[in-house]
Amino acid sequence: MAGRRNLPEHNHRVSEASDHTQPADTVIRPWSSLLIRDYRLIFTAILCGNTSNHMRNVATLYHVYQLSGSSVQLGFTGFFQAAPFIFFGLFGGVLADTLNRKKLIAITHSLSMVPGLLLALLTVSGSIQVWHINVLMVFAGALQVLGGPARQAIIPSLIPQSHLLNAVTLSTLMMQGTQLTAPVIAGFMIDFYGIAASYFVDAFLPLPSVLAALMIRSSGMPQGQRRKIGWHSLIEGVEFIWHTRIILSLFVLDFFAVLFGFYRPILPIFADEIYHVGARGLGMLYASPAIGALIGSGILLAFGDVKRKGALSVIVTLLFALSLGLLGLSQWFWMGLIAVGLLGISDAISVAMRRTVVQILAPDDMRGRATSFLTVFAQTTNATGA
C-alpha cells in the first residue's frame, strides 16, 4: 500500500522535473521525443546495444551448428542465451533502483564488448569450441539482463511525462526494427567477410552506447528512499506489483492472452497442412506479425498521447483474441496473413501500453523492479504458452 500512498507526490515531482523542457500544450508528433537531447542519447545507447545483442545471437547459433552439426547443441546454446533472463532478470531491477542508472548502463555496455571480442579472437586463432560460445553467451546475457531495467527506468527522468507514451513507443519500434535488421546484417557480414568479422562488429557496437550513456545530463540516480541490494528489495517490488491493482490487472490480462494464444509455434502446421504454401509461405507468416507490429507502433506514434491507456489495453487484448479466432477459422492463406498481421498490431500496442502504464504508476525508486518484473513475466509467459 505504501507504493500507492507515495504515487501522487512522485507524479508531481516528475512533472516539475521534466515538463519545463517542453510546453505542457505542445503537440506531440511521432518524432517529438527524439527532439529531446537526453532521450536521443538513451535511444542511441539502446539501438547500438540491441543491434549488438541480436547480431551476436544469430552469429553464435550459426557458429555452433557449423562446429557441431547438432540440433541438440543448438538447443543448449539457445538455453544458455535465455537462462540469464530467468536467473538474473529480477535482480537487474534491484540494481536499477539502487545504483546510478547512467553508470550502470555504461558499465554493462562496456563489459558487453568482452564476449564479442573473445569470440572474434578465438575464431581467428582457430581454437574456438562450442563450450566457449555457451559460457560467453551466459556472460553476455547476464549483462543484458542486469542493465536492461536501468535503460528503461531512466527514460521518464529524461522527458516530460506527456511524452512518455511517445518515447516508449519509439523505443519499442526501434527494438522491433533491430530484431528485423540485425540478423540480416549479421548474415551479410558472415557471408561476405566471415564469422570473425561479425564478432568484431558485435564487439565494438556497444562503444557508442557507453559514450551516449555518459553524455546524459540527468544524474541517473533513482529518486526516493535509498536502498541496499538484497532480497528485501526484491520482495518490496513484488509487494508493489501486488498492491498496484492496475499494473497487476494488466499483467493478468497479458498472462491469459499469451498463455492460451501463443500462436507462433503452430504456424508451420498452418503453412503445411492447411494452406499448403511450403517454406516460402511459412516465412511470410512469420514476417506478417513483425510488419503488423511496425504498423501498430506507427499508429501509436501518429496519435501522440493516449489518455485512457488502460482502456486501450483492454481493447487491443480483445482485438488479439478476435484475431486469434480468425486465424483458427481461416482456410485461406491470405486470411491467415491478415490474422497474424492483426495479432502483431494488437501485441505491439499492448506492449507499449503496459510499459507506459508501469512507468507512470511506479515511483522512480521502484521503476527498475517494476520493469524487470514486466520483462521476466513476458519471457516466462511466452515460454509457458509455447
Briefly describe each language-model feature range:
Residues 61-68, 119-125, 181-201, 273-275, ...:
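Transmembrane alpha-helix termini and helix-breaking/packing motifs in multi-pass membrane transporters
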Residues 60, 146-159, 349-362:
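Intracellular juxtamembrane helix-capping segments at the cytosolic ends
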Residues 47, 128-146, 255, 335-349:
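Hydrophobic core of transmembrane alpha-helices in multi-pass small-molecule transporters
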Residues 17-23, 214-236:
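Flexible cytoplasmic inter-helical loops of multi-pass small-molecule transporters
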Residues 3-4, 16-17, 77, 86-91, ...:
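C-terminal transmembrane bundle of multi-pass solute transporters/carriers
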Residues 23-83, 239-289:
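Helix-loop boundary and gating motifs at the non-cytosolic
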Residues 130-141, 163-222, 280, 285-287, ...:
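Hydrophobic alpha-helical transmembrane segments
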Residues 68, 100, 122-123, 127, ...:
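Helix-breaking motifs and short loop linkers at transmembrane-helix boundaries and internal kinks
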